A protein has these predicted regions:
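A common structural microfeature
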Residues: 10-12, 59, 76
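Glycine-rich, proline-tolerant flexible connector loops at the mouths of alpha/beta enzymes
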Residues: 81-94
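Aromatic- and Gly/Pro-rich amphipathic surface segment
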Residues: 32-67
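Active-site region of glycoside hydrolase catalytic domains
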Residues: 2-46, 89-91, 99-479
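Catalytic domains of carbohydrate-active enzymes, especially glycoside hydrolases
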Residues: 61-82, 290-294
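N-terminal, well-ordered alpha-helical segments
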Residues: 60, 67-70, 100-103, 107
């Protein structure tokens, strides 16, 4: 097939970050602690990686960063608001300095022709709510999220058109101890993974309704960590396992956002295995009311599934902590349902994530066919070891190759009729990796710091910066 599509006029080209990974200023100007401040401090002590106290110092250097964004050619920037910066205790008294920071940030973006795409929640629940009632485990968090979302959406309703609600609920289920602070007494209560997700679905619906009620011409959706799933082989058992994995790892979330239901096959599996969330009267009506206008997709890699025996041991997704290929510490297994596994037909990066640009095209076409809603790419990128040379250059041709192939795949999906609104990859600048500190870098802009010493976080443009600049300048014609 010959592909002739062009990116549409008005296509949004940008890049993404999240508050705790990039801002720093973890307790500056009245900000309260978040669970990520605590989790990253524990990770720093355990594994010797950086914590979130300084991160990439965006809080103090945002004006310089936005100048670089404008030079890059970005016309959108996806970022998150730190709940504990504006409501240090999670509710109640508003921190006016924290709120003003986001006004200043958004005003600076708009003055430079950059459309803000605001994420309300990116893993960083106020620590006080964890201390008070165990955070997202408790249904109480839904009311506090509503107070927070109401504040932010009303505050920025005249400045922000595009909103995403909660980042990567599917990833939170798999990696809950990295994305939430889970007390030791709960670690074996795996039903709580899906209870947390249910509470987030209620919060998502509330935020969707707020945007629709408050923001003129506003658009809102969730940002999902999404991996299309292939069967390991054409054996019927593996194909069925792939279908099961899709139902529980993907459809279970998307059906909520666009149909207001839990995927029946996945929910039946959860019920049969004592993993299903407790659903109260009125919950599904609320979820049904909060329909998304678009879906924001965070795509890094495809995944692979095979049949799992009934007597297999249940486990959740593994992590490669070292950055040495092949060092991943396991794959999710749901007994009798599916087992995730390595795909022998695709290459991986140093952290064992599959490099699969065709998966991008497949994902976009599949989701658009199923749900017929506009799509955004709000994360996509290559985590890698970057080297700052003596003459202050960063020659990241591997990142250029990765992004070239993935943008080309988006263009092919558009040629097949898929409506894609934006490409906002991960990440605008190097930032704190949740698992790997500053060893694993994603940015177009290099942050000169290491795990122990943040130095002054001086910024340097990578080779990929100049390449992406040309991509944006030509609206994706020059890749």
């Amino acid at each position: 097939m010959t592909y002739n599509a062009k990116f549409p006029d008005g296509f949004l080209w940008g890049a993404s970050t999240s508050a705790y990974q990039v801002e720093g200023g973890a307790q500056d100007d009245g900000k309260g602690l978040s669970q990520q401040d605590i989790l990253n401090e524990e990770m720093a002590l355990k594994r010797g990686v950086a914590n979130a106290s300084v991160a990439s110092d965006h809080y103090h250097q945002y004006k310089e960063d936005i100048k670089l964004f404008k030079e890059l050619g970005m016309n959108c920037y996806r970022f998150s608001i730190a709940w504990s910066r504006v409501l240090p205790k999670g509710r109640g008294e508003v921190n006016k300095q924290g709120l003003q920071f986001y006004h200043d940030l958004i005003d600076e973006l708009l003055a430079n022709g950059i459309e803000p795409i605001v994420t309300l929640y990116h893993y960083d629940l106020p620590w006080s709510l964890v201390e008070e009632y165990d955070g997202w485990i408790s249904r109480k968090v839904v009311k506090d999220f509503e107070e927070y979302a109401t504040l932010i959406i009303h505050e920025f309703k005249d400045k922000v058109k595009y909103w995403t609600t909660i980042n990567e609920q599917s990833i939170i289920v798999q990696y809950w101890t990295q994305k939430c602070y889970i007390k030791e007494k709960y670690l074996n209560q795996n039903q709580l993974r899906y209870q947390i997700n249910h509470h987030m679905n209620l919060a998502h619906a509330i935020a969707c309704n707020l945007v629709h009620d408050v923001v003129k011409d506003g658009m809102v959706g969730s940002a999902i960590g999404y991996s299309p799933i292939y069967p390991l082989s054409s054996k019927p058992e593996d194909v069925l396992a792939m279908q099961n994995a899709h139902d529980l790892r993907n459809a279970y979330y998307l059906d909520v956002y666009f149909k207001g239901i839990y995927t029946k096959s996945a929910m039946q599996y959860l019920k049969d295995n004592d993993l299903a969330p407790i659903i109260e009267d009125g919950d599904m009506e609320l979820i049904k009311s909060g329909e998304s206008d678009f879906l924001a997709l965070n795509y890094y890699a495809s995944e692979c599934a095979k049949a799992a025996p009934l007597d297999a041991m249940r486990r959740w997704s593994g992590v490669n902590w070292s950055g040495e290929k092949g060092a991943i510490d396991g794959f999710e297994t749901q007994p009798g349902y599916y087992q995730m596994c390595k795909n022998p037909l695709v290459d991986t990066n140093d952290w064992d994530w599959a490099i699969d640009p065709i998966g991008m095209q497949y994902m976009l076409k599949d989701i658009y066919t199923r749900y017929n809603k506009p799509l955004m790419i709000t994360e996509n990128g290559l985590g890698a070891y970057d080297v700052l040379t003596k003459d202050k250059q960063i020659h990241d041709t591997y990142r250029i190759d990765y992004m070239h192939s993935h943008i080309a795949a988006i263009k092919k999906a558009i040629d097949l009729g898929v409506e894609v609104l934006a490409y906002s990859p991960w990440s605008a600048m190097d930032l704190l990796s949740t698992s790997n500190g500053y060893a694993k870098r994603y940015g177009f802009i290099y942050i000169d710091r290491d795990e122990k010493d943040p130095k002054v976080c001086k910024r340097y443009k990578k080779d990929s910066f100049y390449w992406y600049q040309q991509v944006i300048e030509t609206n994706g014609e020059k890749l």
